[in-house]
């Protein structure tokens, strides 16, 4: 690995005889930072910074490359090349909106956060904040999906979020989770973990079947199976998970993410341990010269009752416990005594000087969310959500033509699923729109028939 990294450092750089270019698909920057953190050899960190600093400056490297006599076009997207596709349209510190290929973008933003942290680069860090806010406030689906265009798998414009032809690649959501996790660990602000959780419990987990044998590459919010036709604008949309793909980045990326969940659950800063996610686990966490053992018992996200046992405490530590934005009546107990909440950036702070047993309780009411009216695709539509889970109305429970279903009240019944372990299903009352005949257009208004709509959970 070091030999390959050294080859990259020799080949690319600002010196005479070196290639003054940068990656077409950003990711090596992340690897170089990680190699620096393992080896402490600063040349790898400097190389990552070089790739970021030169990107989008001067003559565009990819456009100049096309002028070379021996240039060969390999990828069709480079035929009519738009520099924003690879985020090389501006210097990275000047970029304020998420542009181009979604996976490339968030992997680059993750590297920007890493480099900003290592160099204490406030300008680069502010660019990360600007880009993260643009995505989460104007260019991200409620499931955490990013990349609203199937063509070039890219971001488009603010509030352009179609539901039935978007891309929302699984890898893009993994990249967004990586970016958000880095921002959380740098700032200790729980708003970034809200997005990590949104990605993990929705767009990422939806990308893999319960048996782990089939996958979604793209994750639209609305699928009409008969419209998933080849050679159309929905050719990329699949109504069923696929066994494998020609470009098979998503399946192993999901596996890698699930295998590395520990990095998402906890963060450490000095003598402070941050509990980001309430996923049942048992782990050893180094704190200074000590090792703290934490055991968490949890039925989250179906129940808001979490028990945490902390052992091996030999010096004062602070345990930061995230208060989810959707949680109501958050209560904290330590060794049987209810604690007065001391909050900071969305975390409840608990100071421990000895081994302790902690209990966390909160309620997760069903929420009905509405998109900003600038999202034209969502006018007249509602999202049903409980905790981090966005629920999905499916044909197997409610018949076809789901777009005809109308919810006329917010009374929700919760029940245990008979198909998916401890998952909760939601049941609501609603109506179905019925056209007067099979004609395409009519001057007669549609009528309603009563419908009992069963909400089913995503495949988690």
Predicted regions and their residues:
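Long, well-ordered core segments of solenoidal/helical folds
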Residues: 1-16, 48-63, 77-81, 128-143, ...
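Single conserved hydrophobic/aromatic residue that forms the stacking wall/gate
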Residues: 450-460
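Well-ordered alpha-helical scaffold segments within catalytic/enzyme domains
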Residues: 29-40, 107-122, 160-164, 175-188, ...
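Structural helix-adjacent loops and short alpha-helical linkers that scaffold large soluble proteins
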Residues: 1-2, 36-49, 56, 116-129, ...
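Carbohydrate-binding/catalytic loop surfaces
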Residues: 23-36, 65-101, 145-169, 212-242
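C-terminal beta-rich recognition modules with glycine/proline-rich loops and embedded aromatic residues
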Residues: 48, 128, 194-202, 207-309, ...
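Beta-strand-rich binding/interaction modules
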Residues: 316-334
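Aromatic-lined, polymer-binding surfaces characteristic
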Residues: 1-37
């Amino acid at each position: 690995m070091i030999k390959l990294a050294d080859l990259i450092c020799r080949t690319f750089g600002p010196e005479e005889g070196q290639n003054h270019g940068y990656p077409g698909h950003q990711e090596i920057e992340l690897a170089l930072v990680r190699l620096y953190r393992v080896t402490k050899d600063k040349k790898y960190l400097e190389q990552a910074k070089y790739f970021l600093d030169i990107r989008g400056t001067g003559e565009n490297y990819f456009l100049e490359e096309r002028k070379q006599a021996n240039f060969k076009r390999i990828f069709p997207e480079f035929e009519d090349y738009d520099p924003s596709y690879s985020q090389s349209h501006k210097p990275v510190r000047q970029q304020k909106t998420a542009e181009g290929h979604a996976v490339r973008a968030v992997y680059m933003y993750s590297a920007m956060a890493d480099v900003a942290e290592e160099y204490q680069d406030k300008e680069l860090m502010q660019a990360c904040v600007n880009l993260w806010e643009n995505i989460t406030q104007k260019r991200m689906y409620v499931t955490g999906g990013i990349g609203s265009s199937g063509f070039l798998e890219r971001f488009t414009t603010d509030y352009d979020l179609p539901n039935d032809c978007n891309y929302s690649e699984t890898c893009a959501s993994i990249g967004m989770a990586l970016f958000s996790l880095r921002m959380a660990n740098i700032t200790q602000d729980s708003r970034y973990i809200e997005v990590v959780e949104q990605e993990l419990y929705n767009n990422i987990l939806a990308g893999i079947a319960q048996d782990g044998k089939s996958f979604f590459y793209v994750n639209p919010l609305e699928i009409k199976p008969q419209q998933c036709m080849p050679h159309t604008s929905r050719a990329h949309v699949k109504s069923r998970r696929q066994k494998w793909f020609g470009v098979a980045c998503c399946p192993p990326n999901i596996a890698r993410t699930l295998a590395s969940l520990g990095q998402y659950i906890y963060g450490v800063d000095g003598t402070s341990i941050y509990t980001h996610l309430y996923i049942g686990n048992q782990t050893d966490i180094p704190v200074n010269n000590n090792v703290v053992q934490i055991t968490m018992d949890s039925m989250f996200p179906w129940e808001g009752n979490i028990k945490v046992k902390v052992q091996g405490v030999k010096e004062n530590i602070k345990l930061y416990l995230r208060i989810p934005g959707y949680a109501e009546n958050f209560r904290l107990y330590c060794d049987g005594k209810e604690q007065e909440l001391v909050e900071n950036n969305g975390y409840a702070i608990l100071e421990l000087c000895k081994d302790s047993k902690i209990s966390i309780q909160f309620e997760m009411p069903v929420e009905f969310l509405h998109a900003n009216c600038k999202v034209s695709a969502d006018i007249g539509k509602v999202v049903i959500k409980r905790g981090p889970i966005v629920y999905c109305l499916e044909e197997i429970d409610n018949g076809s033509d789901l777009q005809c279903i109308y919810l006329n009240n917010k009374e929700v019944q919760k029940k245990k699923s008979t198909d998916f372990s401890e998952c909760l299903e939601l049941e609501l009352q609603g109506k179905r729109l019925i056209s007067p005949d099979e004609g395409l257009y009519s001057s007669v208004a549609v009528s309603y028939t009563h419908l009992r709509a069963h909400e089913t959970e995503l495949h988690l």
